[in-house]
Amino acid sequence: MKNEIEAMITDITATTAEAEDYTGEDGLLYCGKCHTPKEVYFSKETAQWLGHDRHPAECDCQRAAREKREAAESRQKHLETVEDLKRRGFTDPAMRNWTFEHDNGRNPQTETARFYVDSWETMQTENIGYLFWGGVGTGKSYLAACIANALMEKEVAVCMTNFATILNDLAASFEGRNEYISRLCSYPLLILDDFGMERGTEYGLEQVYSVIDSRYRSGKPLIATTNLTLEELLHPQDTPHARIYDRLTSMCAPVRFTGSNFRKETAQEKLERLKQLMKQRKESL
C-alpha cells in the first residue's frame, strides 16, 4: 500500500519535458519556447512530507493555450445555449433574425427597446413590461423580437408567441390546460405578439384571460404588441375584455408606435427592384 501511494505521488509530481526544455539556474525545468518555469518548488515542510521537492506548473504558453481552449469551449457552449433558446422561444423561426444589428435605425422607439435589454435586471425585479401599441407595420413586433433575441444572447429564456398559436396549442395539447399555461408563464419574459387579434369567442376570451391572469400572478414581466389604440384598451367594449385589458395595462407600460408603415415601404422597394430587373433583362435581349 505504501509503495502504491509513493508511486501515485511520483506520478502527480512528475513533469514531462519537451525536447527544447531546459533546466534553469534555480534547478527547475523551463519551457524552451516561452522560457518560463514548468515546475514550482514545494514548501520545505511539504517537500519533507511528500519526499519530493517540486511539482508541475503551467508555463506561459501552456497557460495561454489552455485559456484559448477554454474560451473556445465556452463560446461554443454559449452558441449552443442561445440556439436552443431561440429554437424553443420563437413560434415563428423568421424572428430569430429580427435583431438590433439588422435594424434600419429609423424607428424612434429603438432606444426604448434597447433600454429594456440594458435594464433587464431591474425590469425583471420590479416586474415592468411594455405594451407596444400603434398602427399596422410600425415595427412593434420587430422591436419586441429584438428584445427577445438580445436577452437570449444573454442566455435569458424568452417565449415570444401569439394567442392564435396558444389557442391552437391548448386545443391540440396532450398535457392539461393548467400545465401548458404554467409552462408558458415559467419563462422569465413572455412576449405576446398581435394581442387583440385572437378569436372573440367566449372560450377564446376565457383562455386569453387565464393566460394574462396567470402571468400577472407569476410576478414576471410581460411584453405585448397590439394594433389596438390605448383608448380601446382603457375603455373596453364589455366586461370580458375589461378583465383582460385591466390586467394587461397594470403590468405593462404603454409605448406608442407612430410613423411610416415599414411593410408598405418594403413592398414598394421590392416592386421597384422587380421593375429594375425586368428593365435590365429587356435591355439585354
In which residue ranges do the predicted regions lie?
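Generic beta-sheet signal
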Residues: 128-132, 188-190, 222
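Walker A/P-loop nucleotide-binding motif
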Residues: 124-144
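Walker B catalytic acidic pair
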Residues: 194-195
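Pre-Walker A (pre-P-loop) alpha-helix and adjacent loop at the N terminus of AAA/AAA+ ATPase modules
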Residues: 88-130
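Active-site donor-binding loop signature of nucleotide-sugar glycosyltransferases
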Residues: 61, 105, 163, 257-259
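Short glycine-rich substrate-engagement loop in P-loop NTPases that contacts/grips substrate
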Residues: 108-117, 125, 148-189, 199-206
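A short, basic N-terminal segment
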Residues: 1-104, 265-285
